Amino acid sequence: MLKQNTALFKPVDVIPDNLFTSGIEGPSYHENGNIYLVNFGNEGTIGVLSPDHQVNEFIQLPSGSIGNGIRIHPDGDLMVADYVGHNILKINILNKKIKIFAHNKEMNQPNDLAFHPAGFFYASDPDWKMSTGQIWLIRSDGTTFCLEKNMGTTNGIEVSPDGKFLYVNESVQRKIWRFKIDKEGNISDKTLFHQCADFGMDGMRCDRIGNLYVTRYGKGTVICLNSRGKMVAEINLKGSKPSNITFGGKDGKMAYVTLQDRGMLESFTVPYSGQDWQRFQKN
């Protein structure tokens, strides 16, 4: 297990309860120091959390759109999984203009996103009613390819720091799968990476050395898995329904977790900086 010293893994409240709806999701750290996340005050909004933990509305999405996962495009814009409109939206970080970057009528409801260092990215796509799911590849020109069908409820998704592996969890089935990624973004060699006996899974993020942090929805914890799928830490939160996680702060070692039962975020320190934060330092 990771060393549990007094400075690590102790959750604290970032903002007051219920500033966000129960649909709070998609936290994503930006190189400008802000964290962007969905459903501030009302459904269909995106909120912004400043480095000093002030939170405000960033933008209202178009009518009929509600965001879920957010990731940062290599050019700095926000990429938002619009699960109601079956779209991937691209929002200019400077002028706030919104465009549909990708759309496919075969998408159930795009849920979470994960970028590859080469510039393409993936979307999880669950069908909650049928307890099934898909994985989509989205290229830099917005073209979409369904890579996997008939999985369980695909939810959390992440690419390893070296770009060699894709991790996808199935919330209802409580399984995390690992795939190999080729240079074109195709995936193969589906392998069971980790399985939990109870409760659900939601968003996932890697730190810079490849540890995978997984939110345990309903259990109120975040687990940390090493690159072999072994649990090396479990962090107990104050809330019970963590939906997603990102890493930020001055050194990238502050984990921010969205809590749907509290409508807010909790944070705790980790031993290694997040991979997205680390990537921004190289740009």
Predicted regions and their residues:
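A short loop-to-beta-strand structural motif that recurs across blades of beta-propeller domains
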Residues: 45-47, 87-89, 134-136, 175-177, ...
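Short loop/turn segments that connect beta-strands within beta-propeller blades
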Residues: 49-54, 92-96, 138-142, 180-185, ...
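Beta-rich, blade/repeat-based domains predominating
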Residues: 18-32, 62-82, 87, 104-134, ...
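A short helix->beta-strand "capping" segment at the edge of beta-propeller domains
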Residues: 1-21, 53, 59, 190-191, ...
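Blade/loop signatures of beta-propeller domains
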Residues: 1-10, 40, 125, 134
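Glycine/small-residue-rich hydrophobic helix-like segments
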Residues: 181-244
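Blade-level signature of beta-propeller repeat domains, shared across WD40, Kelch, NHL, RCC1
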Residues: 243-283
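Short loop/turn segments immediately following the C-termini of beta-strands
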Residues: 40-41, 83, 126-128, 171, ...
